């Protein structure tokens, strides 16, 4: 499993394109969530223009392939920190936190 911390680089986003690019970004992570690539997706509440994704991808290469499809990946508009981890314990009540 991998956790991905994404931070957008405001200075790299072309002027007047922010809203359009964000809509494409939403479509990208929604598509990957709906097909099961992402297990969790959400924005940080304590950091602007940043969020987290958890994926059950088997390899770092598979994660990189997914990330390369993100509109922000091109031209270095975002920074992606990819960390491998093992989910040793998962609370049965985890789903109750959706949207909080």
Each language-model region and where it sits:
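Conserved, structured core segments of small domains
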Residues: 1-100
């Amino acid at each position: 499993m991998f956790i991905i911390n994404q931070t957008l680089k405001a200075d790299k986003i072309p002027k007047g394109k922010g809203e359009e690019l964000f809509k494409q970004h939403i479509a990208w992570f929604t598509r990957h969530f709906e097909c099961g690539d992402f297990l969790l997706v959400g924005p940080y509440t304590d950091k602007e223009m940043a969020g987290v994704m958890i994926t059950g991808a088997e390899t770092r290469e598979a994660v990189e392939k997914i990330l390369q499809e993100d509109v922000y990946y091109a031209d270095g508009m975002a920074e992606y920190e990819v960390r491998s981890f093992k989910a040793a314990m998962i609370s049965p009540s985890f789903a109750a936190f959706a949207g909080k």
